[in-house]
Structure formats: C-alpha cells, structure tokens
C-alpha cells in the first residue's frame, strides 16, 4: 500500500508543478501568477476542488505528455457561492490548446451548466497546439458551441492574463464579460508579425491588442487592472451583483431614503455638462455602483448597483461626453448590457438625459440606423422590470430608444426640470416660428422669446405626463425612495410574449 501511496503523491506533485519548477519561476519573473496561484487568489480560502488533474494527451508521444495537459479545472466558492473555474497553464506547452485540454474545459462547462453556476476562464495561452493539428481546432469548436449553448443560462466570464490569439479569441468574445490584465493580457486574431507580412503595417503586440486598446478603442473588453490580483478582485466584485444563473432572483427588503444632494447635481441649463455618475451614486446604495466598460463609448454609462440592497443594472446618458448623445458604439454597448440583464433577470434602471442621436456623416455611413435599432430591440424584447428616470433632456428618437413607455417601460418618472420633446426647444422654435423670427426687428430676441414659449407649452414634463407617457413627476431628492418602491412593486412581474424561435436583432 505504501508503494501505491508514494506513487500517488509523486504523480500529484507532478501535476501540481505543471511545466516544472524552472518554468514556474520564469512565469513569476514575468510578473505573472501561476495557474494555481490565480485560482487560489480568486476563490474563497481552501474552497478549490480540482477535477481531472491526471488527464493527459492521447495524441502526443509518451515523452511529450504532461499531466493536466496545460489547464487546471475545478470548482469552489466566491463569497460562499459556487463557481466553476479553469486556468490555462502557460508553463505546459505554452498553455496551447489540444484535444484533452479542450475536453477538460468542455466537461467543466457542462458541469457548471448542470449545476446552474457561473464559469470563469483564466486565459493564458499561445493558441492552438500545432502538434495536434485539426484536433486542436475541433476542440475550439466544441468550446465555442458550449459558449453559445449556455449563454443566458449561466454567467460566463473570461479573464485575459496572457496571450490569447487566433481562434482562441472567439471563446472570450462569446462570454458575457472580459477582464484584461495590463501589460500581460493581449487579444488579437492575427499578431504583429503576420500583419506586417501581409499588409506591411508595423505594430507591437500591446498597441495591437493590449488591455488599453480593447477597453477604450475596440470595446471587446469590459474591465482592466494594473495587476493580476486587481483583475481577479474585480471578478469577485462583479459576481457579487450577479445571480447564479438565469433562473434565480434574490429579492431583498426595500429601504426608504432621501437624498437632498440630488436637487443640486444637474444644472438647470440644458447645455451645461455634468457627470451622471454622481447622480447614480446618490440614487444607489452607498459605494455599490460598479461601472462596466468605463473607457469605451463614454457618452453612455452602464453598470451594476444596489438599490435598497437589490441588485439592478443601470444604463445612463453621460452629458459629460458628447452631451450624452447616442452613437454607434454607445448603442452597441448599452444593447449588449441590456440583453445580459434580461437573460439573468436583473432589473433595469435607465437614467435619461439625451439630446438625440449624434449627427455626422461618419455616424450615418457607419450604420447608426442599424446600431441604434439594436438599442430599441434590446429594450423592447427585455421582460425584466424596467424603470426610466428622466432627469433633464429626452429629445426625439433617442427619447423613444431610451426605454420609453412606448417600447415597454413599466414605469417612467421625470424630474420637474425635464424636457421631453421631438427636438430641443431652440431648434423647434426656429422651425415653427421661422417667418416670424426673420420678420422681427430683433430676430435674436424674438427667437429667445419663442424658444421660452415653446419650452413652457410643449417641452416640459407635464405635457408627457398628461398623455400618460410619464407615470409621475417627482422631486430629485425623493427619487431614490420612489425607485426602491417601484422595483419592489415589480419584483414578481411576468410578461408573456408571442411564441417564436427567436427574434432577428439588427446585427
């Protein structure tokens, strides 16, 4: 028996050491944690249970095979809640994916889905394992299939802590959220050398697919961190807002509160910018707002927060950037977030101060019509509780797109200063009273007078409230309490839709 035990411990040690002590040391010298260190830091203390540590490639020669085949898989807890996690081990074949490597990931994904718990992938891989040829590509296909199959069933989170190139990038792209470590995390389909050879363009890996690029330019990633530990801490925080799966909700007791500061945060002058995140923080429970994609499409803000201890998703116009107008990227950013919240029964709050869709030739030529329609589609198809708070401007088609009553909002509140109209009062007055303004002895004075007249008669919140497009006009300071009450009332909302296979969102 002792001989068997000794053999077991030897094999276990081999599995835990991955590519060996020398390669583990090299990993740390690059400022990177090892695969197992990452898992240990991410999960609750002593909660990780490994699965399939002794699996190895059945394709490579005996001399080439290594226990675990370059990926550590298993389950544990985060804040006491079950999660499933895999971590690619760069010290084994450079983390390259082969048949067995893929089988381990697929088995874990299936297990996570059966048990209705989130899955987290810690990516650090050189890509497909060339030695295994098409078997590696087939492995990617099986992973992609499960990413799609379990989308909306369990939360899927990707963490890019090293290279992620070629076909490997499509699995993270199919998941719900992507975190990236600065300096070490990189994603691209074709690397710098291939690009230079094919197109003649010269670029380094960081400028092509680093965390900064994907968080601010491409919009492929949602979060970044200076260190791996900062990134993994962010994953833990994100999960605290999410249900285990798309079939569970966790209602919490309501709490009333008054926030007088809200009376002073939004300038009365509709042309003056301000940071809507200050408004969000006053509406939400203290220190609960968790922004997503803060560096991409800054003219719209998305994120999670708690309202009376209940987790909600927030979509908000950001007047600090482009006056809060809707653009192609803003519409895409918000639409994807709305669909995630709907898939996992997370209520939605829309904080609106929108002057319209951004005018411009590039916006039109690049498809603002189609992209704006995605936002409309996402709001209209969502059946979770949906509440809108209009805090200043709500103009034109953008007003309709930002969760208006017409496309399915359950409740719409407006502040007394809100302006809800086909267009801004100045533009409307210029059209309606064009002849009168031109004939006036003082056109500028007449224009100001007509603008004020139009604003008073047509653009205030009372006209919309009289037509039933606004459910109530409320004071800024009472908004938090009213929103808590609204979401509490909507806790058991059910909404039947026509039966169909699926809609055709304008991709």
UniProtKB/Swiss-Prot annotation:
Coiled coil: none
GO molecular function: acetyl-CoA carboxylase activity; ATP binding; propionyl-CoA carboxylase activity
Domain of life: Bacteria
Region listing for Carboxyltransferase, in residue ranges: 1-501
One GO-annotated biological process of the protein: fatty acid biosynthetic process
Pathway: Metabolic intermediate metabolism; propanoyl-CoA degradation; succinyl-CoA from propanoyl-CoA: step 1/3
Family: Belongs to the AccD/PCCB family.
Protein name as annotated: Putative propionyl-CoA carboxylase beta chain
Gene from which the chain derives: yqjD
């Amino acid at each position: 028996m002792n001989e068997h035990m000794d053999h077991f411990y030897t094999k276990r040690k081999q599995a835990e050491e991955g590519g060996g002590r020398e390669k583990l040391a090299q990993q740390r010298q690059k400022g990177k944690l090892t695969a197992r260190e990452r898992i240990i830091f991410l999960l609750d203390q002593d909660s990780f249970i490994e699965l399939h540590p002794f699996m190895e490639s059945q394709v490579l020669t005996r001399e080439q095979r290594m226990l675990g085949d370059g990926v550590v898989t298993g389950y544990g807890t985060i804040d006491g809640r079950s999660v499933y996690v895999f971590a690619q081990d760069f010290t084994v074949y450079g983390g390259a994916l082969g048949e067995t490597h893929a089988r381990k990931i697929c088995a874990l994904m299936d297990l996570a889905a059966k048990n209705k718990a989130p899955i987290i992938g810690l990516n650090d891989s050189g890509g497909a394992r060339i030695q295994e040829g098409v078997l590696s590509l087939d492995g990617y296909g099986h992973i992609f299939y499960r990413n799609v199959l379990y989308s909306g069933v369990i939360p899927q989170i990707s963490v890019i802590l090293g290279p992620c190139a070629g076909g490997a990038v499509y699995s993270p792209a199919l998941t719900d959220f992507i975190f990236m470590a600065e300096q070490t995390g990189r994603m691209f389909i074709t690397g710098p050398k291939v690009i230079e050879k094919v197109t003649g363009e010269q670029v380094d890996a960081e400028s092509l697919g680093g965390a900064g690029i994907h968080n601010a330019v491409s919009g492929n990633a949602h979060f970044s961190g200076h260190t791996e530990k900062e990134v993994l801490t962010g994953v833990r925080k994100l999960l605290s807002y999410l249900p285990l799966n798309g079939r569970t909700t966790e209602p919490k007791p309501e709490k009333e509160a008054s926030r007088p500061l809200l009376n002073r945060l939004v300038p009365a002058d509709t042309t003056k910018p301000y940071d809507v995140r200050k408004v969000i923080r006053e509406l939400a429970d203290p220190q609960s707002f968790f922004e997503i994609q803060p560096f991409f499409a800054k003219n719209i803000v998305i994120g999670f927060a708690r309202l009376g201890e209940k987790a909600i998703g927030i979509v908000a116009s950001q007047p600090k950037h482009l006056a809060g107008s809707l653009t192609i990227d803003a519409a895409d950013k918000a639409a994807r977030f709305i669909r995630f919240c709907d898939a996992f029964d997370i209520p939605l709050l829309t904080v609106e101060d929108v002057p319209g869709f951004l005018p411009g030739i590039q916006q039109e030529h690049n498809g603002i019509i189609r992209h704006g329609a995605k936002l409309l589609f996402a709001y209209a198809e969502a059946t979770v509780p949906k509440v809108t708070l209009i805090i200043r401007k709500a103009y034109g088609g953008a007003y309709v797109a930002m969760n208006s009553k017409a496309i399915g909002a359950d409740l719409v509140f407006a502040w007394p200063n809100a302006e809800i109209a086909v267009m801004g009062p100045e533009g409307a007055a210029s059209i309606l009273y064009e002849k009168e303004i031109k004939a006036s002895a003082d056109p500028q004075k007449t224009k100001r007078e007509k603008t004020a007249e139009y604003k008073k008669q047509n653009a205030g919140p009372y006209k919309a409230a009289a037509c039933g497009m606004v459910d109530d006009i409320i004071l800024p300071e009472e908004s938090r309490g009213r929103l808590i009450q609204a979401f509490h009332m909507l806790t058991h909302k059910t909404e039947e839709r026509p039966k169909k296979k699926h809609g055709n969102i304008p991709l």
